[in-house]
Structure formats: structure tokens, C-alpha cells
């Protein structure tokens, strides 16, 4: 029996009433995963035995009636450390790495008796927008297997969209949760920078990275964010703000709420079908009582250039630790120490990772630091100021999550600039450290279109309020791909 059409609240009710056990739910979820995995390719590792053992432990002590996540399985992106489960970052460099510790976010999952059922495929070290740079496999879009699932959290998104799991964790450095959520027609939240501990997340861009939830519905997303949020002394960038219940405002009306629609978000490069869908979604929010007005974010057009200087610079520093000496892959082709360093990194990293290391090393090098990295930091400040000006008068910003729907597999592999531009609408949110969500807003030629809602720092509750109001009065989130039993 499959339970993948049951909401988290419904599953919790069944578990509390003992109509199903955590073990039965876990086994059913594993059946759904294996039945769809060949078609979608969401997972690098499926931890059958460990997940069932966890579920049996939870059954033995009993489901906690006050904990909606008790006994619920989920997928975790493979750049988030999981003790006893391979954590590869989809790289040859870490193809056999089994951590001896859990990331803080994973510790919080276990504290709520959640079950990590497997590790989701991704772009290598989270560098990519299509999940095609993975060392292990390519993941297919849940709606059309000839399309990409987005990236870098493509496996996490496809697993939810295809009905393999209800929930997953991803990470977002420049859109890596929101863009695949858009491409697969699910909900994906990039929280405020500092909202979720980065301890145990393999670092890509340390001033940009955030772990976040991916889900079938807005409420489930808020429920999972409530679990993983909170201060962590092991992450100096994590916020000390008290974490409440992110579902608190769900169900409240949005009458009188002011929402900005930047003209740059519907300009050049936005596919006509995507633009039409977002305009329709904005009008729907107006019918619900929101006030939608056009604004300008004039420096957002520089976001991609700024991002690829800053993120690549941070990556070149973070990835220095992978040298063939301490852990991970080591070349067998060496005569001296220099050979170990050079050949290990040449053989262990894929082309996209090496490209970004070179970009970052160049940007930080003597004679170029001021011209590139320092200037990028200055423009980043201008992008932040643009958002601050808008949020002085508006509650939220809306726009498309991505300029297009999911593109063909292998279509942009040899055009990195075109691939980078796919994140033009999500990158500024990371540069400013803001929270942003993608929710299903419609379809263009049979493929999902996501609407992005962006708020000031620590405004996740308000974002969920508006997202849930839209979701409750539309049926886009209820439509499913064929692999999940839908008609599309």
C-alpha cells in the first residue's frame, strides 16, 4: 500500500491511531522509491536497512502524539552530513565517504523521530543548475523525463514531485532549492541566512549557503522548517532568534497586504508563458485582498556576475581541504607530494567544479582582487540596499522563480553562461540573505511554473501566510505527474 498521497497531518493521525506503524510507513515509502527510481534517478544512496531499523525503534517507544513529524521519512541532499550513511556531495572526490557525525539539521530531524530514508542526487558540490554535474548519475524531471529537474537540489525535488517521499532537505546557494522546486511543481523554501545551522553542510559559498525544506504543500514545508531551525553554537553565522511555529499564520487572510512586483522580473529573457502565468498569479493574489504594485530593483541585473565572483571565490577556498591527504579520493598516479595534490584534484573534481575553482582563484589573486572580488562585494551592497528600499514600503516581493520552465537534458551542458543565467531571479535573494519560497503557480506547455515570494529577513511566517492563501484557492499543487498517478 502506498501512502504518498497522504499529507503529513493525515499520516500523523494514522500513526497516532495505530492504523499504520512507522515501520509500515517506511517500508511503503521504500517501495515507492524503488518503483520510481529507475525512471527518475532521485537518489545516490537508499538506506533501506538503517531506515527500517530507525522506524522499529520509533515504534518500540511509541509515536509522540504532540509531534507531527514522529515516524515520518524524508530524503536528505547528499551534501548534508549523515553519520553512517554515505555522503558524497555527488563527487568522485567523496565517492566512499561515510561521515562520523550528523549535521545539526539532521540531529534535529532525529530529535523529532524523523527517518532519513536516503541521500538525494545533486550537482557535484552543489555547483550546477540541472543535476547533470553529478559524478554518479543524471536525475530526470518528474513531469517529463527528457527535461532536467533543475539544480543543484534536483534529486531532492524530483523525489518529492514523483511521489517517492513527501519531504526532503535541500541546500540553496543561488537558487538550488527554489529553481528545482519550480521545475518540478513543488514547494521549496530558502530560509533567511542564519535561520538554519550550516554545521555539517559541505561548504560551497559560505556567505550564501542555507539548508531548507522541500515539500508537496506549503504547510508541510513550514512544519519541516520549524524542525530544522534554531541557533547552533557550532555555526557562528546561525541566528540566536527564538524559533516559533512557522505554521502560525497559515490560514490567515492577506487583505491589505502590500506586495511588490519588480519590473525587472518580467523583462527581457523571461519566457512568455512564464510571464503570463506570474501575471495571472499576481491578479489572483489581488482577488484575495493583496495590493500588488510595480517597483524597481535596478541592481538585480548585476546579480549573476556578482554571485559567480563571490561564490566561486568562496568555493576555491572551501575546496582546498580536498587534497588526497586527509580523507576522500586519492590518486594512485603520483611520485611525490605535489603529484598527490595535483592529480587527486584533477581526477577527483568534475569540470564544473574545476571551472569555479579557477574562477575563484583568479578573482582572489594578487592584482585582480580589487577589480573583481572587492567590486563584487560593493555591488552586493547595492543589491541589498535595493531590497531594503522596497521592504520599507512592502511586505513581500513576488515574481517568477526561474525565467523558463525545465529545459532539455544535455541542452546547456556546453554553455555555462546560459546555465548560470537560469538563476538570475533567485541569486539576488542569496546575496541579500533573504528568505524566498517557490510555490506552484501554473503550467506552461505542460511543465510547472513556480512563483517566488521574497520577504525581509526572518519573515518566513508572512511568506508562508501568503503562499498558503494562494495554494488554498488554487489547485496547481494538487496536479501530479504521470509517475505519481497524475494525468500530466
Curated annotation (Swiss-Prot):
Keywords assigned: ATP-binding, Ligase, Nucleotide-binding, Protein biosynthesis
Active-site annotation: 77 (charge relay system), 152 (charge relay system), 176 (acyl-ester intermediate)
GO terms for cellular component: glutamyl-tRNA(Gln) amidotransferase complex
Catalytic activity: L-glutamyl-tRNA(Gln) + L-glutamine + ATP + H2O = L-glutaminyl-tRNA(Gln) + L-glutamate + ADP + phosphate + H(+)
Pfam families: Amidase
SUPFAM superfamilies, A to Z: Amidase signature (AS) enzymes (SSF75304)
EC number(s) reported in the record: 6.3.5.7
GO BP: translation
Keyword GTP-binding included in the entry's annotation: no
Source species, domain of life: Bacteria
Molecular function terms, GO-annotated: ATP binding; glutaminyl-tRNA synthase (glutamine-hydrolyzing) activity
Function (record text): Allows the formation of correctly charged Gln-tRNA(Gln) through the transamidation of misacylated Glu-tRNA(Gln) in organisms which lack glutaminyl-tRNA synthetase. The reaction takes place in the presence of glutamine and ATP through an activated gamma-phospho-Glu-tRNA(Gln).
Family: Belongs to the amidase family. GatA subfamily.
Quaternary structure annotation from Swiss-Prot or TrEMBL: Heterotrimer of A, B and C subunits.
Protein name: Glutamyl-tRNA(Gln) amidotransferase subunit A
Amino acid at each position: 500500500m502506498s501512502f504518498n498521497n497522504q499529507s503529513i497531518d493525515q499520516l500523523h493521525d494514522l500513526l497516532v491511531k495505530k492504523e499504520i506503524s512507522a515501520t509500515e510507513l517506511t517500508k511503503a515509502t521504500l517501495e515507492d522509491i524503488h518503483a520510481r527510481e529507475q525512471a527518475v534517478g532521485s537518489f545516490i544512496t537508499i538506506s533501506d536497512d538503517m531506515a527500517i531499523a530507525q522506524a522499529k525503534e520509533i515504534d518500540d517507544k511509541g509515536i509522540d502524539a504532540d509531534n507531527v513529524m514522529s515516524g515520518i521519512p524524508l530524503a536528505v541532499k547528499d551534501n548534508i552530513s549523515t553519520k553512517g550513511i554515505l555522503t558524497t556531495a555527488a563527487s568522485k572526490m567523496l565517492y566512499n565517504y561515510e561521515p562520523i557525525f550528523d549535521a545539526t539539521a539532521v540531529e534535529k530531524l532525529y530529535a523529532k523521530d524523523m527517518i532519513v530514508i536516503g541521500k538525494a542526487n545533486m550537482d557535484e558540490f552543489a555547483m550546477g543548475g540541472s543535476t547533470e554535474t553529478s559524478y554518479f548519475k543524471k536525475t530526470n524531471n518528474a513531469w517529463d523525463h527528457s527535461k532536467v529537474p533543475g539544480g543543484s537540489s534536483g534529486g531532492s525535488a524530483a523525489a518529492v514531485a514523483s511521489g517517492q517521499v513527501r519531504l526532503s532537505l535541500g541546500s540553496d546557494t543561488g537558487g538550488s532549492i527554489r529553481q528545482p522546486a519550480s521545475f518540478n511543481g513543488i514547494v521549496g523554501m530558502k530560509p533567511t541566512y542564519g535561520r538554519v545551522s550550516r554545521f555539517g553542510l559541505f561548504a560551497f559559498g559560505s556567505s550564501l549557503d542555507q539548508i531548507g525544506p522541500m515539500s508537496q504543500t506549503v504547510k508541510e514545508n513550514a512544519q519541516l522548517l520549524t524542525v530544522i531551525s534554531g541557533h547552533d553554537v557550532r555555526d557562528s553565522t546561525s541566528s540566536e532568534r527564538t524559533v516559533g511555529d512557522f505554521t502560525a499564520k497559515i490560514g490567515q487572510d492577506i487583505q491589505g497586504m502590500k506586495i511588490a512586483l519588480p519590473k525587472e522580473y518580467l523583462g527581457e529573457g523571461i519566457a512568455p508563458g512564464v510571464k503570463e502565468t506570474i501575471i495571472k498569479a499576481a491578479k489572483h493574489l489581488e482577488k484575495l485582498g493583496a495590493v500588488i504594485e510595480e517597483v524597481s530593483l535596478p541592481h538585480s541585473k548585476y546579480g549573476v556576475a556578482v554571485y559567480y565572483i563571490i561564490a566561486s571565490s568562496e568555493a576555491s577556498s572551501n575546496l582546498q581541504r580536498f587534497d588526497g591527504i586527509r580523507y576522500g579520493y586519492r590518486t594512485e598516479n603520483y611520485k611525490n607530494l605535489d603529484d598527490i595534490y595535483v592529480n587527486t584534484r584533477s581526477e577527483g573534481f568534475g569540470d564544473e567544479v574545476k571551472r569555479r575553482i579557477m574562477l575563484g582563484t583568479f578573482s582572489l589573486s594578487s592584482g585582480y582582487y580589487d577589480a573583481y572580488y572587492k567590486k563584487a562585494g560593493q555591488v552586493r551592497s547595492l543589491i541589498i540596499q535595493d531590497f531594503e528600499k522596497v521592504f520599507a514600503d512592502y511586505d513581500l516581493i513576488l515574481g517568477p522563480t526561474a525565467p523558463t520552465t525545465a529545459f532539455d537534458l544535455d541542452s546547456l551542458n556546453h554553455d555555462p553562461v546560459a546555465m548560470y543565467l537560469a538563476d538570475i531571479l533567485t541569486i539576488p535573494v542569496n546575496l541579500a540573505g533573504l528568505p524566498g519560497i517557490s510555490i506552484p503557480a501554473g503550467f506552461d506547455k505542460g511543465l510547472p511554473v513556480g512563483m517566488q515570494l521574497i520577504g525581509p529577513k526572518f519573515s518566513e511566517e508572512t511568506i508562508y501566510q501568503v503562499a498558503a492563501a494562494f495554494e488554498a484557492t488554487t489547485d496547481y499543487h494538487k496536479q501530479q505527474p504521470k509517475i505519481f498517478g497524475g494525468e500530466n
